[in-house]
UniProtKB/Swiss-Prot annotation:
CDD domains: cytidine_deaminase (cd01283)
Species assigned in the record: Vibrio cholerae serotype O1 (strain ATCC 39315 / El Tor Inaba N16961)
Cofactor(s), by name: Zn(2+)
The protein, known as: Cytidine deaminase
Summary of subunit composition and partner proteins: Homodimer.
Classification of source organism: Bacteria, Pseudomonadati, Pseudomonadota, Gammaproteobacteria, Vibrionales
Gene: cdd
Main function: This enzyme scavenges exogenous and endogenous cytidine and 2'-deoxycytidine for UMP synthesis.
Length: 295
């Protein structure tokens, strides 16, 4: 990953490459740009907003983990706060393809896990597939979300997904990224369980009521959280493990460094993530211990 990031930086225009390099290679870089940092990049580059976001896509794509397709896709989400979040696609050799995370899903979940309550626009290398269009239609900002592709004018999500099916069709009026706290608690004092419980309490699961969260502990001691992102069309739903793995990937972590995992989910939900979580972790490393709590 580091080599790909270096290569991407070398492609950047000289007008803003030094400043961008300083940001991206900083030890505390978290694959986001503040509104102020992005404004400085705009000033230095002299580019229009859309053109700069497209120019930055190679940085996002450099985070991709795609051992199956070797097809590296980047995405950049702008939250309603003005901060920009990078994302990339993620694949798992040995796991069924349904465990794949698309770049759009990665960038959106990245923003969500860092506290964003909505997405203003998303910039991607290639036209979003139907799966991702449906995933984005779950968002709080689905009606106004704009999609920017290289060498094209921006379009709204609804132009890419006309006559769309979404939460409202199932009687749900709160979208993905809505502020929520399910208020679940546990007396279990295991740190990773408590962290997974934090993720569970912000999860989006209006259709199955399987509120769920995952926490991953790395060898470095860092902990990454993932909340379940359910979708009205069911199949585009993003499991909590994948959300947590995306957070780790966007911080430059290696999946080989996962030391332990925890899954907390509702005991009364209509589905369970336990079997799929176990299976995916088994593919990554069969020795990763998984703590489990059903509430």
């Amino acid at each position: 990953m580091r080599n790909r990031i270096e290569q991407a930086l070398q492609q950047m225009p000289a007008s803003f490459a030094p400043y961008l390099r300083e940001l991206v290679l900083a030890k505390d870089f978290d694959a986001t740009f503040s509104a102020e940092q992005y404004q400085q990049l705009l000033t230095l580059s002299g580019l229009e907003d859309a053109d700069l976001r497209v120019a930055l896509l190679p940085i996002a794509a450099a985070y991709s983990y795609a051992p199956i397709s070797e097809f590296y896709v980047g995405a950049i989400v702008r939250g309603i706060s003005g901060r920009l979040y990078l994302g990339a696609n993620m694949e798992f050799t040995g796991a069924q393809l349904g465990q794949t995370v698309h770049a759009e899903q990665c960038a959106i979940s990245h923003a969500w896990m860092k506290g964003e309550k909505g997405v203003a626009d998303i910039t991607i290398n290639f036209s979003p597939c139907g799966h991702c269009r449906q995933f984005m239609n779950e968002l709080t900002t689905a009606s106004s979300l704009k999609i920017q592709l290289p060498k094209r004018a921006a379009k709204t999500l609804q132009e890419y997904l006309p006559e769309s099916f979404g939460p409202a069709d199932l009687g749900i009026d709160s979208g993905l990224m809505s502020p929520v706290n399910h208020g679940k608690t546990s007396d279990d004092d295991e740190e990773l369980i408590q962290q997974a419980l934090r993720a569970m309490n912000i999860s989006h699961s209006p259709y199955t009521q399987n509120f769920s969260g995952v926490a991953l502990k790395m060898r470095s001691g860092a902990i990454y959280l993932g909340a379940y992102a359910e979708n009205a069309a069911f199949n585009p739903s993003l499991p909590p493990l994948q959300v947590a793995l995306a957070q780790a990937m966007m911080m430059g972590e290696s999946f080989e460094d996962i030391e332990a995992a925890a899954l907390v989910e509702s005991a009364t939900g209509k589905i369970s993530h336990l079997a799929d979580t176990q299976a995916t972790l088994e593919v990554i490393n069969p020795d990763i211990p998984l703590s489990y709590l059903s509430l």
